[in-house]
Amino acid sequence: MAAVLYSKAALKALLRLPPDVTRKIRLKFEQYAAAPESLANNVKALRGEQGVLRLRVGDWRVLFTEDGIVVAVIRIAPRGDAYD
């Protein structure tokens, strides 16, 4: 199981979200860290950004990188703003 680390910007965004959304995001990342190969995770690589992946959680997008040992969350944003 990979360790999940959050950037300062990601933590700030997480603290501003409603508690139920925060819980969903954390649960989804725990599921991803436990079984990254599962198709239920709905993870895709972003085009144009080397090594950056996105995880869908409802209307929210979580952008992150992974090296097998550590999953580093870069950004958490609403669907429309996540790719700017």
What positions do the PLM features span?
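Enriched for short, Lys/Arg-rich terminal
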Residues: M1-K12, R16-R23, L27, L53-R61, ...
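A short, surface-exposed loop/turn module that caps and links secondary-structure elements
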Residues: E30-L55
